[in-house]
């Protein structure tokens, strides 16, 4: 039995009509149009594995910025209130923990919990750290950087979460 071997670029041109990727065979090669249209890919082939792109967007997305003057973490926590969040600094790490007990929604009961841990740069002034929650559910953790050679004051302490009434100015990813 003869099997025709096709060049990969030929299969890619037929991508939306003939998905050639099974079980992440081409992992790391980027996203194509049919990766962003999950309803189309599931109707074409029952063996085609859906992209993980959607699950990444549904999880709490965070962004870390560190420039010359300050260190900032943006974290989407829209399902949590300030009372559900705990922000703590231990040594060179900031730990953000969110948990709310079981609540009833349209489909039954739901509970959520997450734990994030970020390494702080060594030159962040830990005595001037702040944390706020915007009206649209974006948690902003920030701290100024100090000139090198000065003591950053490493200790364990809790950072209170304040609520802001305006939406976040963080870029949407």
From Swiss-Prot:
GO cellular component: cytoplasm; nucleus
Modified residue annotations for Deamidated asparagine: 101, 123
Modified residues (Phosphoserine): 45, 122
Keywords (A to Z) from UniProt: Acetylation, Chaperone, Cytoplasm, Eye lens protein, Glycoprotein, Metal-binding, Methylation, Nucleus, Phosphoprotein, Zinc
Region listing for Required for complex formation with BFSP1 and BFSP2, in residue ranges: 1-63
Keyword Plastid: no
Assembly description: Heteromer composed of three CRYAA and one CRYAB subunits. Inter-subunit bridging via zinc ions enhances stability, which is crucial as there is no protein turn over in the lens. Can also form homodimers and homotetramers (dimers of dimers) which serve as the building blocks of homooligomers. Within homooligomers, the zinc-binding motif is created from residues of 3 different molecules. His-100 and Glu-102 from one molecule are ligands of the zinc ion, and His-107 and His-154 residues from additional molecules complete the site with tetrahedral coordination geometry.
Bias kind Basic and acidic residues: ranges: 153-167
Positions of glycan attachment: 162
PTM summary: Acetylation at Lys-70 may increase chaperone activity.
Protein task: Contributes to the transparency and refractive index of the lens. Acts as a chaperone, preventing aggregation of various proteins under a wide range of stress conditions. Required for the correct formation of lens intermediate filaments as part of a complex composed of BFSP1, BFSP2 and CRYAA.
A GO biological-process term: response to heat
Name listed for the protein in its UniProt record: Alpha-crystallin A chain
Pfam families (alphabetical): Crystallin, HSP20
Positions of region (Disordered): 144-173
Record domain sHSP: where: 52-162
Gene: CRYAA
Binding site for Zn(2+) 1: 100, 102
Domain of life: Eukaryota
A molecular-function term among this protein's GO annotations: structural constituent of eye lens
UniProt keyword Nucleotide-binding, yes or no: no
The family this protein is said to belong to: Belongs to the small heat shock protein (HSP20) family.
Residues bound to Zn(2+) 3: 154
Location of N-acetylmethionine modifications: 1
Modified residues (Deamidated glutamine): 6, 50, 90
Binding residues annotated for Zn(2+) 2, in chain numbering: 107
